Regions:
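Mobile-element integrase/transposase regions
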Residues: 1-27, 33, 46-49, 60-62, ...
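C-terminal domain-tail junction helix/linker
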Residues: 2-4, 75, 84, 95, ...
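Short, conserved catalytic/metal-binding motifs centered on acidic residues
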Residues: 9, 32, 65-68, 99, ...
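Phosphate/pyrophosphate-binding loops at sites that engage ATP/ADP/AMP, CoA/4′-phosphopantetheine
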Residues: 54-59
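Short amphipathic alpha-helical segments
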Residues: 77-79
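RNase H-like polynucleotidyl transferase catalytic core
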Residues: 64-69, 83-101, 117-122
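Short small-residue beta-strand/loop micro-motif enriched in glycine and branched aliphatics
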Residues: 33-37, 89-91, 115
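Acidic/histidine-rich, metal-coordinating catalytic segments
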Residues: 42, 60-75, 94, 148-151
């Protein structure tokens, strides 16, 4: 079901000489709904902030997240998961294939988003990233979803699971 498991990871992106940012990504395994946020550092505090944003912006409740064993997903991040009632699954070291959906999503960000000229200031970059994600979640066809965008797929699944009226 939507929100049953969200994979989360970070990606270091070089925007130019001496300009790197930390890109936090999340993808729902059922709908492929994705969210991302950029920060200057990949530490527990930005990771916890990203999780809080995900909880608010996801169109369904988040029940569990899966992360690699990176230090950014310890302490503050673990506390936020516990406080929000979100199960946390931490993968063993050096097992990126177990986080394959978010790893693939990060490749999509590299290929489709980070190949264009982008601002190096975090607020402006986040605005561009949010616009890309809006397109990704609402309009971009996904082969794994039979050509639907994640939010189209979610709407279809919700319609199919809605109670049917038996009145004539």
């Amino acid at each position: 079901h939507p929100g049953d498991l969200i994979q989360v990871d970070t990606l270091t992106v070089t925007l130019g000489p001496g300009e790197t940012i930390q890109h936090f990504s999340a993808v729902d395994l059922f709908t492929r709904f994705s969210l991302a946020e950029v920060h200057t550092r990949a530490t527990a505090n930005p990771a916890a902030s990203f999780l809080a944003r995900l909880m608010v912006q996801a169109p369904f409740p988040i029940r569990a997240v899966q992360v690699d064993g990176g230090s950014e997903f310890m302490s503050d991040f673990e506390e936020v998961c516990e406080r929000l009632g979100v199960k946390l699954f931490v993968l063993p070291p050096r097992s990126p294939k177990l986080n394959g959906h978010v790893e693939r999503m990060q490749r999509t960000f590299r290929d489709e988003f980070y190949t264009r000229p982008l601002p190096s200031q975090i607020p402006e970059l986040q605005k561009k990233l949010d616009a890309y994600l809006d397109h990704y979640n609402r309009e971009r066809p996904h082969r794994a979803l039979n050509g639907l965008a994640p939010l189209e797929f979610l709407a279809m699944m919700q319609e199919e699971s809605a109670p049917q009226s038996h009145m004539c």
